[in-house]
């Protein structure tokens, strides 16, 4: 969030320097990422008055004698410009000066004539017409006539200013504006806040009727609109142009600038519809119809679906709600009547639409963090005041204010001074706390029993309980009042890893030995992750516990699966150019018995495995699982099972001792197609995921593994090449082979072949069988008998033939 120092000074009587204010903001919890001086890179550039000038013979140059006050009254400087005259004041970069971009000015000869500096254009000082009029003229920047020679150029052209680039945390959407930061500055300095003027008068009745309705109040809690006729397009005043320019925006026209100015100043996004382009004089806020299209103001076309909220006229969408207006309803030089819109839209709706369409804007950035329901009222009033002040149009009596029926109420928190001080660990005088809260626009009603009834401002939706009040108090009172103390610690004991910790460490080492790296993700994500994996609405995984005070909507529920987090890690790696990798994560998932929860959820330890890359396949993850099985002296079996997020033909469920441990396989094609990665990556990437109930896995492990002496008798190996239908699962074959005889101690698939010689719909799978008996040598007759039984069972149960 970029906030000009000069704009803050218009709203608060600031009596400290920009550097001092930066420190104060930081001490109150606002990180100033950068304090940008507008005159950065400029030194020894002063006002110079041209007292003599004559053409430099044989060149296009003009020799000037310049009065630079204390720096010299007759400094000779040559210039190639031709727009100046005697007596003009211009910027003079003297010998040894610097300009933006690291340009250094030295005295030198120009076409044989000594020049002791350079006369500057506005562009050479980093200016444009919005910052200082005349800056974009071809030639020198002509300064006001009353400029004093020798004066530093910065205050003359408005470069004696700073831009605060402030990082706004997710819980403070009210600070996404100049006014929001000004409120904090006023509280910090103990100064009054000068609210922007918001009064206006209606001057005429509407000359036509307009229909405005909201069909999705759950996604649009408040929608306000006001009709303004006889629009008069013109240039914006200099002060407004400068405000916009300091925040990185160019002036377009007075009406467009008012909407942008309101966004920056009040933090309220707004839009203006050209009523001559609104079919049926009708505005409706609704969900989009599947397949509807809209072309936005930046000339991008989007195909919509019911997950997108739109503003429509009687025929078509005219705006993406909370993101950007449509090109089919925008104002132009012929606009004569406008409907100004201010609204609040659901954060989730704007965020999902913005992400799905890849369309971001200053408006969507604010709506995604949250705009309170009182904000449209203030934003619209401010915009209408500016319409009146700049004489942009005639404000009619026709206005709309549609809500979801909920009243605007301040949050009330009943607490005591002792509770607040208990959170802080220090004693703060009661009156000091009351004064701080009042400076922050809270009201404090002291009750007869000594408790406080504190009401928060309407824009402070982040304040929920007395610990929030404690935070407000201490950040204004000063964190330096908290006395550092040593932590109370228990006596140090010589501990060690318990059985569960040892097993977890062993699991991680087994996976690391197979080339897998451990990932670590947050325990939260959003319900959108379930949509990403196409998890059905009735699935138990969707019973996620919602966080009461989430950092953001992206981290609003406790995870019930690790797979969404693992997939996001893989996508992030692909976006950053990591084309291949193997990852695992061992962490708890949080399963509620019912919602809303009335008891502690079950934290179930889970293992997730991910592999991605052109060379990875189904057997990468299966091999990792087999490595775990071998490490814990277990035998896994596999069965075909359909899961929403895995490919139906390249996935399986894992079992051990009859217990289902989890699933693994290739990411479903339709999910892969929706990933926010380049198309060539989607076409070339193989993404495989597996998720296991780690507690169920460990329940199959029979205590500590014991040393087993090697059998004195040699094991016998036999390879079988089998031909079967494509539909036959490898796991079914393995299970059938193992059940044929207790002599079979190991079964490994080592080859799969498909070819025309096998016939359509057929495949060949080659298995290596190990036969052994710890008590005796396995005879040839036993081997032949076992192999014969294996083949017979395979043919009878699965229709498999020997190749």
Q: For each of these PLM feature ranges, what is it?
A:
Residues 185, 189-214, 391-420:
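Terminal amphipathic helices with adjacent charged low-complexity linkers/tails
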Residues 114-130, 135-140, 154, 162, ...:
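Mobile "lid/hinge" segments at catalytic clefts and subdomain interfaces of large enzymes
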Residues 33, 47-78, 246, 259-328:
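Conserved mixed alpha/beta core segments that line enzyme active sites in large multi-domain catalysts
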Residues 1-202, 339, 358, 362, ...:
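Phosphate-backbone binding interfaces of nucleic-acid-interacting proteins
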Residues 2, 20, 27, 439-442, ...:
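A carboxyl-terminal module marker
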């Amino acid at each position: 969030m970029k906030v000009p120092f000069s704009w803050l000074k218009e709203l608060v009587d600031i009596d400290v320097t920009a550097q001092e204010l930066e420190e104060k903001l930081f001490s109150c919890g606002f990180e100033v990422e950068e304090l940008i001086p507008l005159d950065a890179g400029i030194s020894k550039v002063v006002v110079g008055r041209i007292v003599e000038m004559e053409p430099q013979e044989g060149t296009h140059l003009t020799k000037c004698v310049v009065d630079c006050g204390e720096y010299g009254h007759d400094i000779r400087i040559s210039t190639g410009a031709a727009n100046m005259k005697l007596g003009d004041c211009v910027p003079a970069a003297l010998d040894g000066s610097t300009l933006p971009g690291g340009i250094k000015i030295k005295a030198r000869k120009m076409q044989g004539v000594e020049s002791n500096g350079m006369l500057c254009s506005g562009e050479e000082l980093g200016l444009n017409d919005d910052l200082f009029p005349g800056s974009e003229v071809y030639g020198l920047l002509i300064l006001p006539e009353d400029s004093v020679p020798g004066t530093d150029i910065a205050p003359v052209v408005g470069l004696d200013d700073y831009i605060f680039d402030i990082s706004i945390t997710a819980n403070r959407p009210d600070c996404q504006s100049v006014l929001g930061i000004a409120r904090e500055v006023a509280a910090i300095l103990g100064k009054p806040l000068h609210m922007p003027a918001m009064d206006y008068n209606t001057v005429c009745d509407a000359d036509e009727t307009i229909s405005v309705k909201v069909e999705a109040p759950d996604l649009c809690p408040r929608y306000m609109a006001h009709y303004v006729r006889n629009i008069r397009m013109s240039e914006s005043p200099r002060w407004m142009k400068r405000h916009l320019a300091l925040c990185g925006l160019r002036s377009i026209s007075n009406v467009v600038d008012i909407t942008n100015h309101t966004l920056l100043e009040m933090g309220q996004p707004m839009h203006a519809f050209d009523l001559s382009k609104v079919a049926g004089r009708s505005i409706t806020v609704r969900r989009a119809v599947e397949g509807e299209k809209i072309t936005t103001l930046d000339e991008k076309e989007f195909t919509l679906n019911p997950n997108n909220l739109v503003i429509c006229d009687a025929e078509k969408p005219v705006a993406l709600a909370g993101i950007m207006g449509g090109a089919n309803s925008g104002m132009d030089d012929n606009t004569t009547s406008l409907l100004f819109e201010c609204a609040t839209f659901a954060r989730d709706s704007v965020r999902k639409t913005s992400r799905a369409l890849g369309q971001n804007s200053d408006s969507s950035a604010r709506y995604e963090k949250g705009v309170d329901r009182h904000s449209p009222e203030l934003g619209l009033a401010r915009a209408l005041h500016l319409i009146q002040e700049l004489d942009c149009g005639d404000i009619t009596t026709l206005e709309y204010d549609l809500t979801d029926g909920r009243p605007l109420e301040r949050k009330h928190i009943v607490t005591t001074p002792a509770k607040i001080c208990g959170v802080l660990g220090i004693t703060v005088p009661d009156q000091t706390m009351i004064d701080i809260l009042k400076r922050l626009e809270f009201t404090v009603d002291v009750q007869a029993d000594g408790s406080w009834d504190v009401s928060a401002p309407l824009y402070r939706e982040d304040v929920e309980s007395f610990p929030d009040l404690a935070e407000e108090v201490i950040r204004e009172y000063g964190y330096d009042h908290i006395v550092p103390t040593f932590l109370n610690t228990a006596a140090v004991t010589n501990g060690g890893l318990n059985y569960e910790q040892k097993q977890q460490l062993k699991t991680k080492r087994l996976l690391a030995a197979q080339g897998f790296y451990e990932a670590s993700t947050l325990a939260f994500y959003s319900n959108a992750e379930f949509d990403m994996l196409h998890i059905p609405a009735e699935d138990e995984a969707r019973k996620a516990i919602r966080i009461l005070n989430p950092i953001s909507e992206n981290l609003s529920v406790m995870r019930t699966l690790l797979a969404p987090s693992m997939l996001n890690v893989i996508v992030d790696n692909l976006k950053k150019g990591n084309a291949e990798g193997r990852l695992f994560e061992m962490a708890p998932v949080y399963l509620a018995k019912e919602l809303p929860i009335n008891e502690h959820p079950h934290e179930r330890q889970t293992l997730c495995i991910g592999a991605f890359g052109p060379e990875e396949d189904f057997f990468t993850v299966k091999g990792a699982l087999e490595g775990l099985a071998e490490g814990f002296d277990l035998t896994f079996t596999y069965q075909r099972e359909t899961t929403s997020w895995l490919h139906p033909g390249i996935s399986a469920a894992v079992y051990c001792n009859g217990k289902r441990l989890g699933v693994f396989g290739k990411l479903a094609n339709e999910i892969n197609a929706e990933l926010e990665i380049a198309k060539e990556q989607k076409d070339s990437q193989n993404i495989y995921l597996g998720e296991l109930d780690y507690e169920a896995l460990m329940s199959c492990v029979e205590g500590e593994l014991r040393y087993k002496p090697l059998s004195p008798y040699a094991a016998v190996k036999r390879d079988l090449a089998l031909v079967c239908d494509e539909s036959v699962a490898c796991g079914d074959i393995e299970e059938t082979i193992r059940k044929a005889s207790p002599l079979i101690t190991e079964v490994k698939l080592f080859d799969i072949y498909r070819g025309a010689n096998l016939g359509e719909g057929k495949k060949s799978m080659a298995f290596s069988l190990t036969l052994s008996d710890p008590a005796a040598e396995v005879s040839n007759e036993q081997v032949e008998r076992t192999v014969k039984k294996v083949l017979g069972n395979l043919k009878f149960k699965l229709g498999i033939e020997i190749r």
